[in-house]
Amino acid sequence: MAYLDWLDRTLQAKLAEKPVGEPVALRFSLAATEDHGLLIPALARALSLASAWLGSRIERLYAMGSLHDGSVSVLAEPAGGQTAFVSSELSRGAIAVRLLLIGNHGTLIWEDSPGADGLKVDFRIEGRSEDQWLREALERSLESGDSEEVRRG
């Protein structure tokens, strides 16, 4: 199983217990080595996960940074009024995953360096159907320098 699929399954199970109440904000950061995929697909997948964890589809986003420099951050606005800040960067070091989920009754923090223990980790970035709409909005926002609506179908 790919790491991000495992993380999604693990976090969904934890969130079902309502440990933070209703999620209201999310900070999600991925630092992956260059051989694991491109920034835009990684960001689209991360935004799709953020949407699932917040329980609300992302309607609008603003991307900033540079593909050339290997670092892009996104401020996203889900339909439910929550806030998501997602970033992805290429790293010459180890893979790093950081997550801060803020709810109306607490916070959840997740930090991991998959593979740092020497075990092989499947860190493929596999796209989902929802990712395509997010990917297109990311590309438009980076090109325009402005926020963009996520246009579905």
Task: Please describe what each predicted stretch is.
Residues 122-153:
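C-terminal helix-rich "cap/oligomerization" subdomain common to oxidoreductases
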Residues 1-36:
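A contiguous active-site-proximal alpha/beta segment in oxidoreductase catalytic domains
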Residues 94-125:
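Interdomain hinge/lid region at the active-site interface
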Residues 4-8, 43-47, 94, 131-135:
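A structural signal for well-ordered alpha-helical scaffolds and beta->alpha junctions
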Residues 84-89, 108-113, 124-132:
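Short amphipathic beta-strand/extended segments with alternating polar/hydrophobic composition
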Residues 26-96:
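Rossmann-like dinucleotide-binding domain that binds NAD(P)(H)
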